[in-house]
Amino acid sequence: MKKNDLEYYDLNADNWWTEGKVLNLSNHLNKYRIDFFSSYIPTWQGIKVLDIGCGGGLASETLAKQEACVTGIDLSLESIKVAQAHARKNHLNIDYYWVFAENLPFAAKKFDAVLCCDVLEHVTDWQKVISEAHRVLKTNGLFFFDTINRSFKSKLIMIWLLEDIVKQIPPGLHDWHKFIKPEELTYTMENNGLNNVVIKGFDLTGGMNWQTLTNILFKGLNPKNKDNKPEPFPIKINEDSSVWYLGKAVKG
C-alpha cells in the first residue's frame, strides 16, 4: 500500500464542502483550532494570514469572514480549484495559489500570521516548511500549527484504528514514520527563530478514554444523530499531546 498518498486530495476535492464526507471533517476540527488561535489574535480584521495546506478553503473562509486578508496555498490543484470556486460563490476575496509549501512565492515579512494545519506530516521536507514560514512572517508574527505525534498511541489510533479497522481515514493517507514528535518540532522552530512555543494536546479521544475509543470503533469519527445528521465527537484541547497536538510560536 502506498503511504502518505496525497493523490487522495485531488481525487476527492469535490468533497471538501460536502457534509459527512471525510475531508469535510476539517470543518469540525477548525472550530477548535481557530478558537485556540484566536486566543492569541482576538480580532482577525485586517490581519494578513497565510494558510499553508488550505485544501478546499475551509479555514481560509472562516478567517476571511472575520475580515482577515487571507492567502491560501496547497499542493492539490483540484483542491485549489474548489477553494477558488467556493470563495467566488460566497463573495469572499481570498488569494489561492497552487505551490509547494517548501518554496513559497512570497516576499519576506509579508504576513502577520501563518497557519499550517494537518500539513507537516504530509510534506516532503517539513523543516524547510518551517524555514519558509519564518521567512514570510513579519517580526512578532505568529506561526500556528497542528500535526500528529510519532508515538505508539498515534499508530494505534490514527493508523490501526482509523485507517485499517474502521477506515474512517482512507488507508494509506498517512505514513506513521512521517509523524513528528513535539520536541522535534519545537527544536526546529526555535532553530529557525520561532520562539515562545506553546504546545497543547488536540485530543480526539478524551485522553484515550475507552468509551470514546469504543464509540469510534463502532461509529467512526463522524457518527449521525437521531435526525441522521453528522455529529462529530467533541475535541478537547488539553495537555495530552501523545496523538495529535497544536500550538503557536512567535517570530522574534
List the predicted regions and their residue ranges.
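N-terminal, positively charged/glycine-rich alpha-helical extensions of SAM-dependent methyltransferases
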Residues: 1-18
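A short acidic, Gly/Pro-enriched loop at the edge of an enzyme's catalytic core
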Residues: 102-113
